[in-house]
Regions:
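Gly/Pro/Ser/Thr-rich low-complexity, intrinsically disordered segments predominantly at protein N-termini
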Residues: 1-172
């Protein structure tokens, strides 16, 4: 499938698709049991100056990591300037993304996505493991901080004012 065909195509099944150099890659979208994680993250974000200035967290927003590759992180952070650019048809790369790991994920795909994100310009990736209530915070493909319990999660340098503990993220 060409990129142009993909852009016109609409899925008729229950998958969300990413595009990788002509290949459609089915992924699962954010599940209902992950909604509380997004809501907690979003509610914390609502308290920031970035939110008040028009920046936004977007669930399942597509973005092109290369001219041939489109990804959809579970959550992406776009500045108000990036949102204005997108509104005029320009492409934007989020500075911060969150992926909620599921039992269907495999390490090869996860590692590949992290590398793609950083190569595209993403500054921070949170890989959230709900089953273990653990978050891996990447600031590069090689630098990771594993957080649990009352460890502080930070979206710095992309969004330094967004901070919360792992326990707060997982509180229902």
């Amino acid at each position: 499938m060409t990129k142009a065909e993909f852009l016109r195509w609409e899925s008729d099944d229950n998958y969300v698709y990413e595009f990788n150099d002509g290949i459609l890659e089915p992924t699962t979208g954010m599940r209902q049991d992950e909604n509380y994680l997004f809501s907690t993250l979003e509610n914390t974000f609502f308290q920031t100056a970035s939110f008040r200035s028009g920046s936004r967290l977007r669930p399942e927003m597509d973005f092109w990591v290369t001219d041939k590759q489109m990804r959809r992180a579970d959550v992406s952070y776009f500045t108000s300037q990036q949102i204005q650019q997108m509104n005029t048809g320009q492409k934007a790369i989020p500075g911060f993304v969150v992926e909620f790991a599921s039992h269907t994920d495999n390490d090869v795909v996860s590692i590949t996505k992290r590398h793609e994100y950083f190569e595209a310009g993403v500054q921070v990736v949170w890989w959230v493991y709900p089953l273990h209530q653990e978050v891996h915070v990447y600031t590069s493909p090689k630098i990771v901080t594993i957080c649990t319990d009352n460890d502080i999660l930070s979206a710095a340098p992309a969004l330094p004012e967004l901070k919360m503990t792992v326990a707060e993220l997982f509180r229902k």
